[in-house]
């Protein structure tokens, strides 16, 4: 079960822009991530590689934690991610991440957001 302090450390890492590093430090080796109803990606190395590939496609990303809740081994985070692509186009995703933790690391995470929002 994560402590509030541990969750706050994770959030701070993401907000600082260290997305791949946060996965390396805060996810179990066998962790999974799932986008809406898509098939989950499994394995921390796979998750890190995917995150790095996403970040290579953008000029910048701003990550904001709107709210977070810890309830035992379950965590909910409302994130807002604002992307600026190399083309200059932008996109904003307001999403909820539901996480299941094992001890002080994330084991399973699922993101819920509106996938139909095009880049501005």
Regions found by a protein language model. Give the residues of each.
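Hydrophobic/aromatic beta-strand elements that line small-molecule binding cavities or substrate pockets
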Residues: 51, 63-69, 80-81, 94-100
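Short, cysteine-centered beta-strand-loop-beta hairpins and adjacent loop/turn segments enriched
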Residues: 57, 83-92
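Short beta-strand edge/turn micro-motifs at domain boundaries
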Residues: 94-117
């Amino acid at each position: 079960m994560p402590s509030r302090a541990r969750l706050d450390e994770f959030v701070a890492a993401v907000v600082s822009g260290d997305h791949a590093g946060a996965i390396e430090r805060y996810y179990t080796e066998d962790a999974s991530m799932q986008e809406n109803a898509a098939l989950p990606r499994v394995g921390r190395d796979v998750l890190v590689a995917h995150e790095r590939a996403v970040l290579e496609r953008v000029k910048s990303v701003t990550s904001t934690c709107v709210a977070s809740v810890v309830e035992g081994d379950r965590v909910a985070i409302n994130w807002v991610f604002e992307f600026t692509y190399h083309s200059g186009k932008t996109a904003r995703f307001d999403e909820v991440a539901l996480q299941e933790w094992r001890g002080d690391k994330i084991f399973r995470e699922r993101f819920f957001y509106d996938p139909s929002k095009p880049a501005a």
